[in-house]
Amino acid sequence: RISSSVIAHKTQLDSGKREVYSSHMQLGGPK
């Protein structure tokens, strides 16, 4: 059984990665 805090932490990390990825795409993609 996974605790809800772990799920919340993973969700936060995933959304952070998406923000970084979208900002990279706006700059013309990852360097």
Curated annotation (Swiss-Prot):
Keyword Transport on entry: no
Pathway: Lipid metabolism; malonyl-CoA biosynthesis; malonyl-CoA from acetyl-CoA: step 1/1
Any GO BP annotation: fatty acid biosynthetic process
Source domain of life: Eukaryota
Reaction(s) this enzyme catalyzes, per UniProt: hydrogencarbonate + acetyl-CoA + ATP = malonyl-CoA + ADP + phosphate + H(+)
Disulfide bonds: none
GO MF annotation terms: acetyl-CoA carboxylase activity; ATP binding
Keyword Lipid biosynthesis part of the UniProt annotation: yes
Top class in the EC scheme: ligase
Biased composition, class Basic and acidic residues, residue ranges: 11-21
Keywords: ATP-binding, Fatty acid biosynthesis, Fatty acid metabolism, Ligase, Lipid biosynthesis, Lipid metabolism, Nucleotide-binding
EC code: 6.4.1.2
Region annotated Disordered, chain positions: 1-31
More details: On the 2D-gel the determined pI of this protein is: 4.86, its MW is: 16.9 kDa.
Protein known as: Acetyl-CoA carboxylase
Organism whose genome encodes this protein: Catharanthus roseus
Lineage, uppermost ranks: Eukaryota, Viridiplantae, Streptophyta, Embryophyta, Tracheophyta
